[in-house]
Amino acid sequence: MRVLTALLPLAAFLAGPAGAQASDRAGHYYLRGVMETGSELMLHPDGRFQWYLVYGALDLFAEGRWAERDGAVILTAERTKDVPEPGFRTLVLKVEDRSLVPPDGRGAYVRPADDRD
């Protein structure tokens, strides 16, 4: 029992940064740097996301789960009542500083507080 009690602070220390990292990444992002395209991404701290992209007459939506690993945020869309046909199945966004870069490398999802150009 004493060994278990002694290891609890270590377990809390090791578990802390992973949870903090995920909650630090959570937030409201806007796509920047792509002409005539509107897109927003909301990463919720509970691991859920909401996303949309509008380009001309094309409107795409998705919601589902997100996770961060290997320098990327992975969005996995799910069919829901509100979004029966998601705009993608899986989307991998590369983490660059505090921005999230789409696979084609054009534009980046940024949070307004981080956008200081």
What role is predicted for each listed range?
Residues 1-4:
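Positively charged n-region of N-terminal signal peptides that target proteins for export
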